[in-house]
Amino acid sequence: MAAKKAHGNFRLNSMSNRHRIGQIILHIVLILLAAYTLAPLLLLVFNSFKSNNEILNNPVALPSSFTTEYIQKAMVAIDFWRSLFVTFIVTFFSVLLLVVVSAFAAWGMTRAKTKLSGFMYLCFTAAMLIPFQSLMYPLVSLAEHMNMKSIPGLIIMYGGFGVSMSIFLYHGFFKGVPISLEESAMLDGANIFQMFFKVVMPLMKSTTVTVIVINAMWIWNDYLLPFLVIGNSDGTTTLTLELYFAKLKTGQYGNPWELIFPAVFITIIPIIVIYIFLQKWIINGVIEGAVKG
């Protein structure tokens, strides 16, 4: 009996040691992946406070002093506040359009339960597989013929391109919402809009935040569609376009890295801050949509 007990304790200790070693290896791998992911961002931050000579001599070193001189110069070079306002307007109204249209569309498809609604949902999800590059030239031609090469036209196009993914996320959530809640609201005298915004919408906060953040990050950082639609229009360029059109290109003595790094840094700060504060909602929204779908 004593021998069997000792053998059992040895097996438990052996399993515990293997588990501990496995956890250590897992943590090392995760730390390396985190370092690999954060390294470009840290380099961007450090080099935003360096002179051009410091960057060229040792781009991975800490700055000699954390001065905002180069950030201020970069803000002037890309006309930061004006382009920030334009980017905010485009992002805000594009996301608002996406949320309203995709929420209503996904809700209608889940409640109709017909072959047509199923086919429409299939078309929307299949549209996510179409690469944007295959639509560029027809899009530019259509925008020119319909006089949509403007900020409102850009907002409408973002609504069209982002609606497929948004419907996909909302559709999975709506399938798990009991229709009895909506029927009860209708019996209490609510019209379809009151029922949707006062009963259904409050139930999908996490999914809505997920749709907002995913689309806001994409629209905020997008360069190609604004370049094709509005180009270098005076007073209506977004931050990403300003990074290209501003005087940050190769000059007689090379690239002005002391302006390029801080310009990119201040451009991505707003969307990073939004993501940090809303990441919990994003994860919950994706999980809810997957489980209920």
PLM regions: where:
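A structural signal for multi-pass alpha-helical bundles of membrane permease subunits
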Residues: 8, 18, 22-293
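Short, Lys/Arg-rich, polar N-terminal cytosolic tail immediately upstream
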Residues: 1-17
